[in-house]
Amino acid sequence: MKMEKALNITSEIGKLQTVLVKRPGSELENITPEYLESLLFDDIPYLKMMQKEHDFFVKTMQGSNIEVLYLEKLAAEALRAANNKESFLTKIIKESNQMDESALYVRDYLMSFDEEEMISKLMSGLKKSEIPERKKKHLNEMMDEQYPFFLDPLPNLYFTRDPAAVIGNGVTINKMFQPARRRESMFIELILKHHPRFSNQEIPVWSGREEPFSLEGGDELVLTEETILVGVSERTDARAVERLAESLFSRSPKIKRVLAVEIPETRSFMHLDTVFTMVNYAQFTIHPAIQNQQGELNIYILEKSENGLDITPRRDFKRVIAEVLGEPEVDFIPCGGEDVIVSAREQWNDGANTLAIAPGEVITYDRNQVSNDLLRSAGIKVHEVISSELSRGRGGPRCMTMPLSRENLK
């Protein structure tokens, strides 16, 4: 009997079967005003309401018979299965730039916890006040007294889309652009290597977190079984896209082309999926501001050749998308409509960041009323979720999910 693949993503819109999320936790309560910028937040969310909103989001998915797995639970189970807490902890501490005796204090303290508690601490951050007072021997320890953390919190973890992305039956485990997020992909790596659900399968890693250039899941869209669309953005480096293409062409029998689309390097457009997502077979939502008045932007078609890669530059974005989908035309639904003020406001609140749970069926934030009405007018079934606190992190329903399995399109 052939074993069913643990990972299977061959489109953006196939019926969503299994998804990985992270419930917002105490890491959000370790954000303070002076560290907002370094932790990539614009405001301090209200955790209790944020959790209610996230629970509503999860129930919405479960109501469509989607299996929802929690990152924190799987990570603890994987750590227990690995039977080597110290090895994982050593890697985490090393990537947190802890040195000298402080690294030993941190390790000894965290080793006293069971797997669930340890994972919780590693995600929420470790305050200096939590460890008993000790004598400081080194200059850097004495001078760094005002900084409150041994291990920084990971408040962006509820955006599970970015640390990794499934392509086909394999995965990219990503090198994150910002230091504040770099440890996040370690939890995905731990789960895929050691959790019983995944460890007995040979899962190809198309791009690993040891890569020299940054790549993030919000920039990775699986258009078809043969075509990947990747944003070159504030967070994803063009060199990472080229290396990913080379890896896919040499190791994946299905992938024939990678499309690289250039988007402005700004915080509001931090990933491709903040300005462009697929909602149906030939329908997409788009933030109009990423194109010029003629609907053009830079897109590059990467294909395998005898000498390595062929790269073809194009400007006619809509036509390229139609061609790779085998459609005569595609419909671009503008986020916020034609009004530039409404469009900018709703894009800022993730109006273009839809999560497709089936062809023509999406989950969106309730606050983006103009965008949601336009989707419905275009024949899309829209499930709205409450979002006053979730949206403060600058990510929407697609950002908050890492799809592990979708039905293949017929």
From Swiss-Prot:
Keywords: Arginine metabolism, Cytoplasm, Hydrolase
Entry's EC annotation: 3.5.3.6
Single GO term (MF): arginine deiminase activity
GO biological process: arginine catabolic process to ornithine; arginine deiminase pathway
Entry-linked Pfam families: ADI
GO cellular component: cytoplasm
InterPro entries to which the protein is assigned, alphabetical: Arg_deiminase
Pathway, per record: Amino-acid degradation; L-arginine degradation via ADI pathway; carbamoyl phosphate from L-arginine: step 1/2
Signal peptide: none
Residues of the active site: C399
Compartments in which it is found: Cytoplasm
UniProt cross-references to Gene3D superfamilies, sorted A to Z: Arginine deiminase (1.10.3930.10), L-arginine/glycine Amidinotransferase, Chain A (3.75.10.10)
Reaction(s) catalysed by this chain's protein: L-arginine + H2O = L-citrulline + NH4(+)
Family: Belongs to the arginine deiminase family.
PANTHER family according to UniProt: ARGININE DEIMINASE
Entry protein name: Arginine deiminase
Source species of the chain: Listeria monocytogenes serotype 4a (strain HCC23)
